[in-house]
Each structure stands twice: as C-alpha cells, then as structure tokens.
Amino acid sequence: MKSRHKKLALIGGALAIIGIIAALVLNALNSNIALYISPTDVAEGKAPQGKAFRIGGLVKEGSLQRQADGVTIAFVVTDTAKDMTVHYKGILPDLFKEGKGVVAQGKMAADGTFTASEVLAKHDENYMPPEAAKAVGDAQAKSAGAEKPKASY
C-alpha cells in the first residue's frame, strides 16, 4: 500500500470508530430521557405507552393510602383539572405530604394507573418542582378559559 492509501484507511477507520461511539452515546442518552407529562395530558391520551415518563402536580388531600406491607403506597396526583392515581413501592421522601408538590417517574400500568419507580417531593415551603408548577398553571389557565365566555366583536 502506498503512504497515501494508508493515511486514507487510518482516517476512514478513525471516522468509523467516532461514528460508532457517537451512536452508542446518543442511544444511551435517548433511553434515559423521561418526558414530563401532566395528569391532563395523560387523560387526553398523550402519555407514551411502554416508556418511562414523569408526572407531576399536587398530591390530592385525603388520597394517600398505605398497604398493609408498609411500603406499597397509592396516592392521587392532580394538576387541579385532572387526577391520576399513582402506585409506588418504596419509601417516600420525608417531605412528601398531601397538598404539596410532587414529581413521580415511572410507566402507565394496564389498568390506567401510573406505576412510579421514583417519587420526588418539594424542598421547602416556597418551592414546587418546575414541571409541577407549570402543569398546575396550565391546568388553571385551561379551566379559567373554559369557564369564561369569549368576547365577540
């Protein structure tokens, strides 16, 4: 082989290796992405089937139910427009309370409930997870817009 052909082969091999590494990294990142979906979006059928996503809002007052085993919990997440039942098996964060902000990551179950693999609670009195705050604000805006008749000129 000539020197020129060796250089071209080396450059081609390096580009192929870089391409394979880039494809593997993008595949790993794509599989770890969890979209945020509000309870209203889930009710409208916008939740991905068979893929993990995050759902957020407020824990509905009086909805927390603990099973006899002590680690299985069911609660309702609301964005003030729609509600979604969440099932979680594990220890809840210390700051988890009814009426407070929460974001849960998991998948939709066959029965239409959300099975969470992770539950995140708010940090302090003034904090609500950004996704939950946006969902609550959007839901309130939708319900306010639906209640008010639109002006015609």
Curated annotation (Swiss-Prot):
InterPro entries: CcmE, CcmE-like_sf, NA-bd_OB-fold. Residues 130-153 are annotated as: Disordered. Pfam families: CcmE. The keyword Cell membrane applies. This is Cytochrome c-type biogenesis protein CcmE. Heme binds at H123, Y127. Residues 29-153 are periplasmic. Residues 1-7 are cytoplasmic. It is found in: Cell inner membrane. NCBIfam families: PRK13254.1-1, PRK13254.1-3, PRK13254.1-5. Belongs to the CcmE/CycJ family. The chain crosses the membrane at residues 8-28. One of its GO terms (biological process) is cytochrome complex assembly. One of its GO terms (cellular component) is plasma membrane. Its main location: membrane. Keywords: Cell inner membrane, Cell membrane, Cytochrome c-type biogenesis, Heme, Iron, Membrane, Metal-binding, Signal-anchor, Transmembrane, Transmembrane helix. The gene is ccmE. GO terms for molecular function: heme binding; metal ion binding. Heme chaperone required for the biogenesis of c-type cytochromes. Transiently binds heme delivered by CcmC and transfers the heme to apo-cytochromes in a process facilitated by CcmF and CcmH. PANTHER family: CYTOCHROME C-TYPE BIOGENESIS PROTEIN CCME HOMOLOG, MITOCHONDRIAL. It is a single-pass type II membrane protein.
